[in-house]
């Protein structure tokens, strides 16, 4: 501030700034998985992290899982989005597995605890059913029927899930109950809920239909965190304050299968529930305890460590990696063991549209910093889906203009096909010729690169060999090149282009066949005896001759634009004067000089003066800088000339070096 009386005011500023290098080896992948968050970006840094987050591969998810796994053999920063079909995918819940019932006639004079027996024809199948709620007149409002024995019998007689007319429910009343009729429907297979995005989870949990089912069966709202069959392996033990005090003598009912099991809460917790609104919650997965926590159904309640333990707040903040829950309509004093079921990944139902929606999460370059898109991970899908999705990802790359999209041919074009026919298929798919007029990859983009093969690879999780697209490996080669060399070096060739974990390739091409592929900007992948399996080309997906028709030049310019572009934002709202232009020119020239010294640039020039910042440009509040760059080029073609000469010939004279 301005001094109004004698004194000393100290001010500090700086005129120094620099261009900072940013990551160039972060990859992105969208695909189908059997577990994990849907339609949100998750960072994965290693294979263990991949398995824990998205589950192990299945036949339907292997292409995507193994593509992700393959990239992580080279790099260590992968961003993944899981795609699901919103209409069919389900989170496991305690609703599935219950018997749907209708209280056709509520009767009168019944009491809570009156027994209900489920019969098949004349045989007693389940004898532990009970009335759980009646009104003042003894009319039945709610019942509980364990389903474990009913499930087994229904499977045995071929009446699963719909229970036919042979199934009946009989009520044995100890309180002179009269005239009630309960009609049995089907064993519920639909969990009734999908939590796709975490921000919408609370709305899904408190939806009218889902809450009505919870109230009908008298169970709290606890579900698996993610959609998929793996949620069926989750079990939740919930213990009230009263039952916690009983220790192992508290026998907890198991929902919905039936039976009881002794509480283990005393052995797990040092401090249990302190009030009647608190519950000890133990989460098991595959019978192993993975989480234990005391939570409350009362808003604002805290634990002994003064931490907020309100159920809705705890789960909304991501308190569990396994379950999600709500306190709404939580049965007062509930104790029991919930076995979840009905989870569906529904990967067979995922469409090209679902995959494209997942890829759209990477469209904004300001919020998502990735440089390598593994679009070819979908190459195992149908010809139409593989072509459509990869084109969409290329359009994202073209719009971002800061990344490289790695694409692979659809599996049916190369796997199990003679090499000559496979090469024809690749060329026709690339050029929209022959039978590929509708489903093709007839694009031109310097922000994409196409490989021309698939690899046969061992799947250690299922003990089988699988055909896997190579796009993730090519992205991995780019990331590894950044680590062992520089971004502007080509990822192809014997020095940096070695592909890992290959049993064999789908096709082994010869020179003439590789020539055909390379002319259409398809980079061959080949294997020669003793030299490994190698990326044998570094073209981008364009037919326009330019410096950008090579991967190394494209990645060089992506890096330069990103790094210099981020530095330039600090000129926003500064004055467009000689000092600003000179400082920016000096700063960027120093950065480019460093790249030149490392071999990425042959020559460069930065123009940022009054020639491109004219008075009219300045009056429009604009700032212009132009960079002229001679990028380093990779060697694609080697010619070795051997000349025989006469004995005693003068080599200097023959080569024109004499005199």
From Swiss-Prot:
Q: What does the entry list under GO cellular component?
A: virus tail, sheath
Q: Does the keyword Thylakoid apply?
A: no
List localization entries.
Virion
Q: Which UniProt keywords apply?
A: Viral contractile tail ejection system, Viral genome ejection through host cell envelope, Viral penetration into host cytoplasm, Viral tail protein, Viral tail sheath protein, Virion, Virus entry into host cell
Broad class of where this protein is predominantly found? virion
The record ties this protein, via InterPro entries, to: Gp18-like_dom_I, Gp18_domIII_N, Phage_sheath-like_beta, Phage_sheath_subtilisin, Phage_Tail_Sheath_Structural, Tail_sheath_C
Give the GO biological process terms.
Answer: symbiont genome ejection through host cell envelope, contractile tail mechanism
Question: Has the keyword Nucleotide-binding been applied to this entry?
Answer: no
Q: How does it assemble?
A: Hexamer.
Which family does the entry's similarity section mention? Belongs to the myoviridae tail sheath protein family.
- Give the protein's biological function: Structural component of the bacteriophage tail which consists of a contractile sheath, a tube and a baseplate. The central cylindrical segment of the tail consists of a rigid tube, composed of multiple copies of gp19, surrounded by the outer contractile sheath assembled from gp18 subunits. A total of 138 copies of gp18 arranged into 23 hexameric rings constitutes the sheath. During infection, contraction of the sheath drives the central tube through the host outer membrane, creating a channel for DNA ejection from the capsid into the host cell.
Protein name per UniProt: Tail sheath protein
Q: Which organism is it from?
A: Enterobacteria phage T4
């Amino acid at each position: 501030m301005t001094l109004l009386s004698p004194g000393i005011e100290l001010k500090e500023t700086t005129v120094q700034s620099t261009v900072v290098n940013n990551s160039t080896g972060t990859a992105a992948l969208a695909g189908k998985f059997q577990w994990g968050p849907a339609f949100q970006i998750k960072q994965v840094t290693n294979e263990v992290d991949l398995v824990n987050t998205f589950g192990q591969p299945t036949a339907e998810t292997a292409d995507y899982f193994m593509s992700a796994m393959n990239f992580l053999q080279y790099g260590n920063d992968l961003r993944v989005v899981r795609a699901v079909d919103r209409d069919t995918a389900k989170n496991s819940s305690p609703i599935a597995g219950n018997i749907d019932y209708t209280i056709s006639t509520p009767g009168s004079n019944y009491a809570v605890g009156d027994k209900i027996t489920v019969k098949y024809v004349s045989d007693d199948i389940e004898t532990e059913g009970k009335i759980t709620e009646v009104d003042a007149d003894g009319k039945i409002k709610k019942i509980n029927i364990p389903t474990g024995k009913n499930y087994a019998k229904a499977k045995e007689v071929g009446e699963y899930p719909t229970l036919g007319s042979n199934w009946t429910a009989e009520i044995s009343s100890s309180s002179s109950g009269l005239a009630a009729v309960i009609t049995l429907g089907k064993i519920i297979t639909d969990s009734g809920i999908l939590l796709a995005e975490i921000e919408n989870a609370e709305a899904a949990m408190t939806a009218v239909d889902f809450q009505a089912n919870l109230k009908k069966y008298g169970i709290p709202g606890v579900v698996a965190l993610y959609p998929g069959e793996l949620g069926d392996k989750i079990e939740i033990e919930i213990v009230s304050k009263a039952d916690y005090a009983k220790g192992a003598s508290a026998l907890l009912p198991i929902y919905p299968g039936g039976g009881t099991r002794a509480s283990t809460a005393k052995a797990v917790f040092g401090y249990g529930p302190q009030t009647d609104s608190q519950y000890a919650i133990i989460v098991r997965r595959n019978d192993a305890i993975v989480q234990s926590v005391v939570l409350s159904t009362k808003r604002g309640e805290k634990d002994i460590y003064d931490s907020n333990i309100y159920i809705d707040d705890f789960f909304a903040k991501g308190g569990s990696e396994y379950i999600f829950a709500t306190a709404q309509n939580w049965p007062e004093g509930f104790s029991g063991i919930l076995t979840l079921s009905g989870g569906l990944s529904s990967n067979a139902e995922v469409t090209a549209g679902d995959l494209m929606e997942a890829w759209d999460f990477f469209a904004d370059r300001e919020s998502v910093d990735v440089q390598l898109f593994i679009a070819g991970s979908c190459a195992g899908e149908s010809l139409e889906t593989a072509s459509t999705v990869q084109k969409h990802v290329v359009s994202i790359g073209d719009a971002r203009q800061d990344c490289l999209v790695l694409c692979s041919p659809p599996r049916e074009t190369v796997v199990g096909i003679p090499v000559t026919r496979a090469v024809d298929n690749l060329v026709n798919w690339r050029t929209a010729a022959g039978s590929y007029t509708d489903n093709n990859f007839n694009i031109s983009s310097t922000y994409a690169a196409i490989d021309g093969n698939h690899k046969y690879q061992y799947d250690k999780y299922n003990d089988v060999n699988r055909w896997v697209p190579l796009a993730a490996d090519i992205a991995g080669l780019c990331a590894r090149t950044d680590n062992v060399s520089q971004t502007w070096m080509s990822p192809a060739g014997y020095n940096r282009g070695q592909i890992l974990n290959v049993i064999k390739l789908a096709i082994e091409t010869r020179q003439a066949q590789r020539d055909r592929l390379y002319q259409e900007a398809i980079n061959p992948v080949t294997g020669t005896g003793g030299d490994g399996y190698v990326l044998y080309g570094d073209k981008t997906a364009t037919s326009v001759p330019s410096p950008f028709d090579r991967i190394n030049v494209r990645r060089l310019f992506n890096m330069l634009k990103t790094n210099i572009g981020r530095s330039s934002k600090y000129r926003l709202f500064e004055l467009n004067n000689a000092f600003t232009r000179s400082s920016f020119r000096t700063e960027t020239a120093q950065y480019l000089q460093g790249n030149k010294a490392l071999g990425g640039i042959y020559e460069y020039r930065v123009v940022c003066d009054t020639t491109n910042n004219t008075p009219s440009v300045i009056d429009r509040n604009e700032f212009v800088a132009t960079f002229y760059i001679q990028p380093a080029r990779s060697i694609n073609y080697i010619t070795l000339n051997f000349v025989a000469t006469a004995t005693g010939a003068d080599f200097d004279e023959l080569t024109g070096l004499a005199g």
